């Protein structure tokens, strides 16, 4: 079913892998040999999550993670970690004494499902979930490639 690269056998916990009977149609979470769900909030489940073969228990579409809380947007600053990216959010902070703004940024680590392909500079939308590790509390819900203009707003380009 999936690429077995770990020492433990990887499988989705809600899927029965034996051959009792064949699966029915492609309803969310039912039938076939793959569990997937719609996370709601206006986000579509990626085709790779439905038809892919990856196993990721921290994926919001195929794993045991629910999205609740904040929905944020930012730019992928680093994609060097395994299934984790750093999202940079730029903002302006007002200095009362000088009546001016200064540029600031915050880095947010976010888990990215293997259903997405992301490069540095891509715009991403992330949603808050339960703590996935010591620092990761967000999950990538949508990737907007850097070259496209849909949904991307012009902001200052960094320091």
Swiss-Prot record:
Gene Ontology cellular component list: cytosolic small ribosomal subunit
Keywords: Ribonucleoprotein, Ribosomal protein, RNA-binding, rRNA-binding
GO molecular function: rRNA binding; structural constituent of ribosome
InterPro entries, A to Z: NA-bd_OB-fold (IPR012340), Ribosomal_uS17 (IPR000266), Ribosomal_uS17_arc/euk (IPR028333), Ribosomal_uS17_CS (IPR019979), Ribosomal_uS17_N (IPR032440)
Pfam family, one: Ribosomal_S17
Record bears the keyword Transmembrane: no
SUPFAM superfamilies, sorted: Nucleic acid-binding proteins
One BP term from GO: translation
Membership in a protein family: Belongs to the universal ribosomal protein uS17 family.
Protein's UniProt name: Small ribosomal subunit protein uS17
């Amino acid at each position: 079913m999936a690429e077995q690269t770990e020492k433990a056998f990887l499988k989705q916990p809600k899927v029965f892998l034996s051959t009792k009977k064949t699966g029915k149609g492609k309803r969310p979470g039912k039938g076939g040999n793959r569990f997937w769900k719609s996370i709601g909030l206006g986000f579509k489940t990626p085709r790779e999550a439905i038809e892919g073969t990856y196993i990721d228990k921290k994926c919001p579409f195929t794993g045991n993670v629910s999205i609740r809380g904040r929905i944020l947007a930012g730019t992928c600053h680093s994609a060097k970690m395994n299934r984790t990216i750093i999202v940079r959010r730029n903002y302006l902070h007002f200095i009362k004494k000088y009546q001016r703004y200064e540029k600031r940024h915050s880095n947010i680590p976010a888990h990215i499902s293997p259903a997405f392909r992301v490069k540095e500079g891509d715009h991403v939308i992330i949603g808050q979930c339960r703590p996935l590790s010591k620092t990761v509390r967000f999950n990538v819900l949508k990737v907007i490639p850097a070259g496209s203009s849909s949904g991307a707003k012009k902001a200052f380009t960094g320091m």
